[in-house]
Amino acid sequence: MATSARIDDLKGAAQSFAHLAQGHRPEGHNPIYGRLHNDTVAAFEEAMMSVEGGDDAVAFGSGMAAMTALLFAATQHGDHVVALRPLYGGSDHLLSDGLTGLKVKWVEAHEVAAAVNEDTALVLAETPANPTLDLVDIQSLAMAAGDVPVVIDNTFATPVLQNPLELGATMVLHSATKYIGGHGDVIGGVVVGDEEWMKQVRQIRIGTGGLLHPMAAYLLRRGLGTLPVRMEAAQTTARRLAIRLVEHEAVERVHFPEFPACDPKGLVGTQMRGPGAMVAIDVGDADKASQVMESVQLMTPAVSLGSTDTLIQHPALLTHQLMDEEAKEDAGVSLGLLRISVGLEAVEDLWNDLDQALSAR
């Protein structure tokens, strides 16, 4: 946990500093300073590299720090980026508010090939998408992008259910805060890819200071050990809830990756090894959504996801609030939409809670 490493050889330390500043791991060099390298953070990165099938990984203090560094590493001011909606609201806002200086073209998956041009630096997608849970065919997306790097936000699926690098993606992004941490008590992000890309991403982390705290890295590495068990249990419960919610009179539509409306190409079972543990429901309007969210007793009305506790939130007014109304409509982020991150509580307890909240007058 020390911030600095002892320097007994100044010339060697100078060489180490230059080595690290170029985005390399220490590899026998003095780590110099905690912003340049930390062994605990590196252990988490190595674990993520292994589970995602990449050559290297770079961890950050948050998912948005990871997204920002990735964009800085892969693009220059004025570059063209093709992005698929919906994305996490924070990512959407970063791409839309002009801060990055990028020219962003928002498209649907089938429009990517036509949208890519000689100035396109990056294609970006999230699958399952946040918050509608629509699936994107990663292999087809990579083919449509051609030589343009493809970044996939794999937060909802996790490495347990989906490995985008094996399907042609260039880099994979995670908000490690969510399923990887798994207990709602740590914030972090990580990017996985090949060595050359990760050297560039690591250089941005060094320059901007977005390093993951060692204690957070420890918690995230620990969370990876239970991720398969947690995901399997939560997914089983989510499936049972989704099936029952289809029949509830207060629910107009259920979004769940295993349902054809979210997965018309049959990607669950091929691209994904399971549907995951997220469910979204449309209850018609903001008033009803507010009533449901404020009526739950076992579930926690809160943003974030992937915890052992079941969380319910209203994307249009919370996580995706900063999107303009037209963009929300195009992305399917309606005022009646509620996103549910299913946790590890007993399925009947969760159903009873949802049923009473949906039936409240």
How would you name each of these model-derived features?
Residues 1-30, 302-303, 307-316:
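Mobile, glycine-enriched helix-loop/loop "lid" segments at the mouths of ligand-binding/catalytic clefts
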Residues 11-65, 90-98:
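Conserved N-terminal alpha-helix of the aminotransferase class I/II PLP-enzyme fold
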Residues 55, 105, 310-361:
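PLP-dependent enzyme catalytic core of the Aspartate aminotransferase-like
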Residues 56-250, 255:
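Conserved PLP-enzyme active-site core in the AAT-like
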Residues 112, 286-291, 346-352:
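Short, conserved charged micro-motifs
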Residues 209, 296-306, 357-361:
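A common structural junction motif
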Residues 219-229, 276-284, 339-343:
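Short, well-ordered beta-strand elements within core beta-sheets of diverse protein domains
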Residues 239-303, 323-329:
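Conserved small-domain helix->loop->beta segment predominantly found in fold-type I
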